[in-house]
Design a protein with these regions (language model features):
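N-terminal hydrophobic/helix-forming segments and targeting peptides
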Residues: 1-368
Length: 368
């Protein structure tokens, strides 16, 4: 079996070479499909462009498991021309300093090439969320075109992975690595789906449309794989975070039990395995989109620095996560696929189910 670390980092590096914003995820989608073909995994695209890969399980009675990540990242979209440059509208949540003058950007052309430029300040009213962009080499552009921050595609800097779009390419990379591990190793009990969605940053659009369409079986346990800003109790280098909920929803215990049981199994195998558990209230993730449509949901998160490229003192910088959190997330997801049918046997559930005989008798003797 190929080395997990090498594979997981290779996938992430390849994904990082394809900048994307909402509705313009072609480069990431093409790379996802190319990797799935290399793995030999079956996949399809729905009517909305979401990619759904499937690894068949061995037990038709077992719940399916789906791991979901999105392919887009916040940025701008060129929507028109102006005598002083090009008008661009914000796509998703970007730092306030993005609207100031002098922010280096890259315009993505249809052939995949990039044109360098910079913002020259806000255009229109503040509520319009628009800027003017001036290119280093002026040229006519035909909108709409994606605009991303001119930041590094991918870099391994010591223990940190730095990228323009860790959110959510780390989720996509972890799913691809999980699928590769499952394809080469022992089959899981239930079917496992890897889902790569579009337009998450502008309202979970791809996930909502997919959940509403009922593409996944209704008894599927859905895991959102996301990068989410660090919080107390969700620290970098301490392992992936089992996400209890987000800013809008508390997730379901039944789905979370798959991750809890996977964590226990990994700890039994390697007592140095790090994993955290926390309510990640810094934003909303795709688990909420599926929860609204009746799915049992949970999530994992990679604690993220420079969320949406917002660095201290208003700087625009690459996002970053700890390599151990990323690799630990791949291990957790892969093990979770094998724990679907054993999820009710977590240590906590067993401890609550088994009331000691002496305590039972004492309650009977003192009932009054």
């Amino acid at each position: 079996m190929t080395d997990l670390k090498q594979r997981a980092l290779d996938y992430l590096s390849r994904l990082g070479g394809n900048p994307a914003t909402a509705f313009r995820e072609e480069g990431v989608a093409s790379t996802v499909k190319a990797i799935l073909r290399e793995i030999g995994a079956r996949f399809e695209q729905d009517a909305f462009g979401n990619i759904i890969a499937k690894v068949p399980g061995t037990d038709p009675s077992a719940n399916p498991l789906a791991v979901v990540a999105h392919m887009d990242h916040p940025g701008f979209e060129i929507t028109g021309s102006h005598p002083d440059g090009h008008i661009a509208t914000a796509m998703g949540g970007i730092p306030p300093s993005s609207f100031e003058s002098g922010v280096p950007v890259q315009v993505l052309l249809p052939d995949g090439s990039r044109v360098n430029g910079a913002t020259t300040g806000r255009y229109g009213e503040e509520s319009d969320r628009q800027v003017l962009i001036k290119l280093e080499q002026p040229q006519d552009l035909e909108p709409p075109l994606s605009v991303v921050f001119d930041l590094i595609d991918y870099e391994l800097d010591g223990d940190m992975i730095r990228m323009r779009a860790v959110d959510d390419l780390a989720g996509c990379g972890s799913i691809l690595a999980m699928i590769a591990q499952l394809t080469e190793g022992d089959a899981s009990p239930g079917d496992v789906y890897g889902v790569f969605t579009r337009a998450e940053e502008v309202g979970l659009v791809g996930a909502r449309l997919m959940a509403d369409s009922g593409t996944l079986p209704p008894d599927t346990l859905v895991i959102s794989a996301e990068s989410s800003r660090t919080l107390p109790g969700a620290e970098q280098g301490e392992g992936p975070v089992i996400r209890v909920g987000d800013a809008g929803f508390t997730f379901t215990a039944d789905a979370e039990s798959v991750l809890i049981r996977a964590r226990e199994t990994l700890n039994e195998r390697d007592n140095g395995f790090k994993c955290q558990r926390q309510l990640m209230s810094g934003g909303t993730c795709e688990a909420s989109a599926f929860a609204v449509f009746g799915y049992q949901t949970t999530g994992i998160a990679f604690p993220l620095g420079n969320y949406h490229n917002g660095a201290p003192e208003g700087r625009i910088e690459a996002e970053y996560i700890h390599i151990d959190d990323y690799l630990g997330g791949v291990k957790l997801l892969t093990e979770a696929a094998h724990c679907v049918s054993d999820r009710t046997n977590t240590a906590f559930r067993q401890r609550l189910r088994e009331v000691p005989a002496d305590m039972r008798q004492r309650m009977l003797d003192t009932r009054g």
